[in-house]
């Protein structure tokens, strides 16, 4: 898979959907909206547009200073799946800070990982693309980030 390239772009040249996606993320981070549906309604953005851009558009300051990222996974319940996931995260140079796994129900489990990316040897999107290739990972997304 091709490595992702990032660009620094002035806000006034971004399409409306991307600017509004950033507004929705800000509302959710600051608890000014109770849900994604509430936030997109406040900024007049479709939910599909928000989900299209939410993992692709970030304020510049977050790309510079963020070192802790929380990831959410939906996994098939297989022996060794969590171990393989954690090994891939460790191989990227990330440090696992916390792990939360639900009890598997109907062959599926949810896992939330908080990782430190300060020593990471690749960017978070490259790691996410590698993780998506595991056949036992049904879903991976960034839940949040912080310093």
Curated annotation (Swiss-Prot):
It holds the Pfam family ACT. Residues 70-145 form the ACT domain. InterPro entries: ACT-like_dom_sf (IPR045865), ACT_dom (IPR002912), UPF0735_ACT_dom-cont (IPR008310). CDD domains: ACT_PheB-BS. Belongs to the UPF0735 family. HAMAP family: UPF0735. This is UPF0735 ACT domain-containing protein RBAM_024960. It comes from Bacillus velezensis (strain DSM 23117 / BGSC 10A6 / LMG 26770 / FZB42). The lineage of its organism: Bacteria, Bacillati, Bacillota, Bacilli, Bacillales.
């Amino acid at each position: 898979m091709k490595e992702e390239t990032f660009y620094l772009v002035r806000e006034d040249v971004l399409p409306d959907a991307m600017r509004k996606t950033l507004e929705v993320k800000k509302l959710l981070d600051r608890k000014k909206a109770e849900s994604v549906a509430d936030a997109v309604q406040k900024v007049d953005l479709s939910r599909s547009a928000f989900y299209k851009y939410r993992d692709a558009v970030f304020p510049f300051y977050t790309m510079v200073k963020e070192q802790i990222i929380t990831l959410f996974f939906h996994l098939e319940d297989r022996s060794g799946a969590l171990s393989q996931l954690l090994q891939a995260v460790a191989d990227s140079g990330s440090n696992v800070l916390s792990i939360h796994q639900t009890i598997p129900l109907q062959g599926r489990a949810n896992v939330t990982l908080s990782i430190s990316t300060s020593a990471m040897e690749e960017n978070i999107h490259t790691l996410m693309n590698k993780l998506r290739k595991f056949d036992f990972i049904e879903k991976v997304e960034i839940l949040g980030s912080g310093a």
